[in-house]
A protein has these predicted regions:
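Conserved N-terminal structural module of periplasmic/extracytoplasmic solute-binding proteins
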Residues: 9-11, 22-99, 111-113, 274-278, ...
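Short helix-initiation/N-cap motifs at beta->coil->alpha
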Residues: 62-71, 90, 157-159, 230-244
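A structural signal for short loop-to-beta-strand junctions that line the ligand-binding cleft
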Residues: 74, 82-83, 112-145, 175-176, ...
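Paired acidic/hydrophobic, glycine-rich loop segments that form the ligand-binding mouth/hinge
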Residues: 83-86, 248-253, 266
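Hinge/lid segment of periplasmic solute-binding proteins
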Residues: 89-140, 152, 157-163, 189, ...
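Glycine-centered hinge/linker elements that transmit conformational signals in sensory
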Residues: 163-164, 204-231
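C-terminal lobe and pocket-closing loops
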Residues: 254-266, 271-371, 402-403
Length: 404
């Protein structure tokens, strides 16, 4: 059988070219559900269909939030995890110190990329001077109020207490203010207003610093003297009170809004604190970072997806369809986003927020701090005594963590 010259040349060229290059698969782990997941998957589909993918294909896996951090810790260092994962910055330092988990991305960064984000969100992605992730979305608590009970939100703590007292009737189960004040995360906004914090500038624990004691003394005043707060707060109780019109104001975040759809509510800045020389309440900000896994064999493609996920077009989808607050600062100039009162309120609140510490030692703080909060609100110890005990326990826990 004779083979034409054209066919023969084609066969030779194919042989020289070798086998077709396999499409790169970029596996991404996330913990989104509901509308957040739908918006995220829409961005992923857009990426896969675009020229930006350059032969790569992103596949996603939704991992339950409660199991997410442990799965990353167990799987990624052994090369059994994703190429990219999305999680808040509070575990960042621990994963970096553990090794072989998160790839530093300073090599990939340029001014155009770093300049797209709110500076505080980039700070959250930085550990010991090195950047390890691109900020995707942030979350903060703010003041949420029932418009039928309160014509205008308070701007100061003096105004807050005055308004809350008028709306409080413990016998009827009504309170001017309700929030999970016994939880250290929620309390941090008040603590930070006084200039307090968890660590010193040298990253040493300092839970019992005077400013932290002052913040707790103010909380005790609201609870015991002003009596504007419900006893034994819980997320279920606070949600129930607000939905029933029995709580006029709440300190909470975007996760709370889905639970109060039937209430005519407004959002406003957390008040300034008269007792702290008029400084603002400064909530902790959690930032969802997009991280490239250190063992990934496709780091270039993984970073390319991370960059796409945090660009302006993706931010618009995440904001308007996923109801998230993107770290990309340009999105807030978008007409539809700027006109959205919820997105605008959280954007305003983040201006005075502080990134939650991303040190590995932070994991040693939560339990002692929460115990201290409960001891104080249950009147079992003074703020100073409870914080002294928490400080001692945190120091001991950190020493064990570091093997000393």
């Amino acid at each position: 059988m004779r083979i034409s010259k054209t066919v023969l040349l084609g066969l030779v060229a194919a042989a020289l070219a070798g086998p077709a290059r396999a499409q790169k698969e970029i596996v991404v782990w996330h913990a989104y559900r509901g509308g957040e997941k739908a918006a995220f998957e829409k961005v992923v589909a857009s990426y896969n269909a675009s020229g930006a993918a350059k032969g790569a294909k992103v596949t996603t896996l939704a991992v339950p939030y409660d199991a997410f951090a442990d799965k990353i810790t167990a799987a990624v260092p052994r090369g059994k995890g994703p190429d990219v994962f999305i999680y808040a910055q509070d575990r960042l330092g621990g994963w970096i110190e553990a090794g072989n988990t998160i790839e530093p991305i300073d090599f990939f960064l340029d001014e155009a990329t770093t300049g797209r984000f709110l500076p505080s969100t980039m700070e959250a992605m930085t550990y010991r001077g090195t950047v390890y992730g691109l900020p995707l979305n942030y979350k903060v608590i703010t003041l949420i109020y029932n418009k039928k009970l309160l014509a205008a939100p308070p701007r100061t703590t003096a105004e807050l207490v005055a308004a809350a007292k008028k709306l409080t009737d413990p016998a009827a189960g009504k309170y001017g203010l309700a929030y999970w004040y016994s939880d250290y995360y929620y309390h941090a906004a008040l603590q930070n207003a006084f200039g307090g914090g968890v660590f010193t500038g040298g990253n040493k624990p300092a839970l019992n610093r005077p400013e932290n004691v002052q913040a707790l003394e103010l909380l005790v005043k609201w609870l015991e003297r002003d009596r504007i707060l419900p006893a034994e707060p819980s997320t279920a109780l606070i949600t129930s009170l607000f939905n029933q019109g029995k709580a006029a104001m709440v300190f909470s975040g975007p996760w709370f809004l889905g639970e109060i759809a039937g209430v005519d509510y407004g959002l406003a800045l957390l008040p300034t604190v008269d007792e702290a020389d008029g400084r603002p309440m400064r909530p902790w900000m959690t930032v969802e970072g997009v991280y490239v896994a250190a063992p990934s064999a496709n780091k270039d493609a993984a970073y390319a997806f991370a960059r796409y996920l945090t660009d302006l077009e993706a931010a618009r989808v995440l904001a308007l369809e996923g109801r998230q607050t993107p770290a990309n600062q340009a999105i807030y100039a978008d007409a539809a986003v700027a006109a959205d009162p919820v997105l605008a309120a959280f954007r305003k609140q983040v201006e005075v927020a502080l990134p939650m510490p991303n040190l590995p030692e932070m994991t040693m703080v939560w339990s002692p701090a929460t115990t201290a909060m409960n001891t104080i609100v249950n009147k079992s110890a003074t703020p100073k005594a409870a914080l002294d005990l928490a400080q001692k326990e945190v120091v001991e826990r950190i020493a064990r963590l570091k093997g000393r």
